[in-house]
Amino acid sequence: MSSTIKKIGIVDCNNFYVSCERVFNPISIGRPTVVLSNNDGCVIARSQEAKDLGIKMGEPFFQKRDFMDEHRFCVYSSNYNLYGDMSDRVMSVIKKYASEVEVYSIDEAFVDFSNIPDEELTDRLHLIRNEVKRLTGIPVSIGVGPNKTLAKLTSYIAKKKEGYNGICSYWTLQNFRNLLYTISVDEIWGVGRQWSKKLRKIGVDSIGQFVMLNDSLVRKMMTVNGLKTKMELLGMYCHPVKPVPKQKKNIASTRSFGSDIDSFDQLAEAMYSYIKNGVKKLEDNEISPNRATIFIAGNRHKEEKHHNSKVVKFESQTRDVTQIWSQVYPYLRKMFKEGKKYKKCGIIFHEFMPENIEQGTLFSNTVQLVQPPVNVEKNWEMRQEYMSQKFTTSWEEIPSVFV
């Protein structure tokens, strides 16, 4: 391998949400296991055992409940506090053994291994995989190639093809071009559902067929980004690893309610709760917003399809809960309509400034402070009938060990 060729890897957690649950609920190991979306609506994560039994992503839970009972499934409500914390732990282990790491998603990280000598690369990959498993309990697959697109592809091969044991390097693959004809275009990094449909309409079903297309046709169908994808599949380098995360354009805190509500007090308490959750995200990112969009909406599956939103400009950049609530409250009161039922609300913060140049004072004389809602019946809270404990983020729910 030439010293000038990039060695880009991706560390991908296997069935991440399910794996997080299995770390603390070993009873689910070996049994078909699923994690459900907000309000226990749809399947959003599946163990291999669940996949083998035909459970599909996005399937409504109520349609499969009896089937899952019959096959002794382990079912969990989504526990995002747990998943977020476990993700941080996985990423911290990866960063111990790699200098350039781009956290791509909650369960994936791109790594630039270009400074690792060729003869040491395989050992480094096994070290990372073993250490992540040992220190967090999360199994991962690792793919390495000369660019991000081929790293994603080799990661797919490491997961899906026999004989790789969770690690695949582009440079060790035999008959690579022939292998591309066995993999669907759906598995190309960055090729979404719409592009896949367009490609299939012209008879392109496999990656092997895709890379044989004329460059001008690819660019016309899929823009310059599609052409870059094709170039990377042919071994070129177009997308660098970016260790510094991009500045977030917005931070949202929204949820659907467990049941429809028609009380302003309940709506206000839900909005206040989401503001607090959003402020926690602002604090984690050390940024403060200048504006926020608040919205309330009816149930889109019923006749109550109404939706209302408002952009609130804060008097100064702030992430103080009381300040934000006091400026949001008057607009929320105006937006609420008696007799209407609501299924969802939320707040989206935007127009950020870094912490060190935040302007304004903590409490402005022109903002009349509003007390938060208290002692309100929480009919708005999400249904989470199968929620596991917050094993790593709550002292009250930390596992007990007896000796």
Predicted feature residues:
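Short, charged/polar, Gly/Pro-enriched secondary-structure boundary elements
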Residues: 117-121, 302-303, 353-359
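DNA-contacting surface of Y-family translesion DNA polymerases
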Residues: 187, 197-341, 359
